[in-house]
Amino acid sequence: MKVLFVASNRIGDAMLASGVLAELARRHPQARFTVACGAAAAPLFEAMPQRARTIVLKKGKFKLHWFALWLRTVANFWDIAVDMRGSGLVWFLAANRRARLASRDETIHRVEDAARVLGFAPPPAPVLWLSDAAKRAAAKLLGDGPVLALGATANWSGKIWPPENFLALAEALTAPGAVLAGARIAVFGGPGEQAAAAPLLAGIGARAIDLVGTVDLATAAAAIARADLFVGNDSGLMHVAAASGVPTLGLFGPSDERNFRPWGANAAFVRTAESKDALFARIDYQPGGSHSLLTSIAVETVEAAARELLRRARREAA
């Protein structure tokens, strides 16, 4: 049995739809899967047990990447062809069953939206597949003892909580007698985000574990999964953290938590008092701008939410 699954180019979107892929695999244990996605998201699928291959999409002019993908898939007969990108590709392939994300429902979470494509109910939670090699690499990086993971970057500055706030939070959560007393602090981010994380890393000093663009995504994901708590901006790594099962606290302002809050029993979020629309309405928003829209979120608010989340997770694990 052959299944084609076209996933997102983006880490976060690919992660949020991973539960649909995992549920397909659970329902069809004999199937072999071809996953098509962008280079950034491809490592998320490397350790999927039933994956036969990954086709990495390279965006081309005039959407020619879709024609290139069609050329690489048209010779196969697919038992199931699923397109989470919403293109028309599946209609030009030989398949027993075709499904595509035709439109977004902006009133529900992206996990629920993804589940609609194949009618899965309840919506399957995102799944993080980790290889033994990635786990070993993460163990070597983090070692033993408690770890606080911080996702202090994002794809634009408006979604980034100020680094001085992350530093104050880390100091409060790891102080003597605190919920993560003495924990080391791992800071995560992607390639090209080093400048955004530099002030935080400098403030943490010797206790910092710098994982901002220093390791591949699979290793970063495995390292996040080893942490005791993840606190981060709305980003792909936040969704990776939630899928791993680590207690995950997301920080929201100019993105909608109805669609993008971290998904799972061990997840929570804090957002600005102002809505996404209100934040955009009161500023002269320019893509790529250099100002944070999360400055109104107090350190004390995030600290309290983090402590409550961690206590709840520990209570449920006991």
Language-model features, listed with the residues they occupy:
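Catalytic machinery of carbohydrate-active enzymes
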Residues: M1-A318
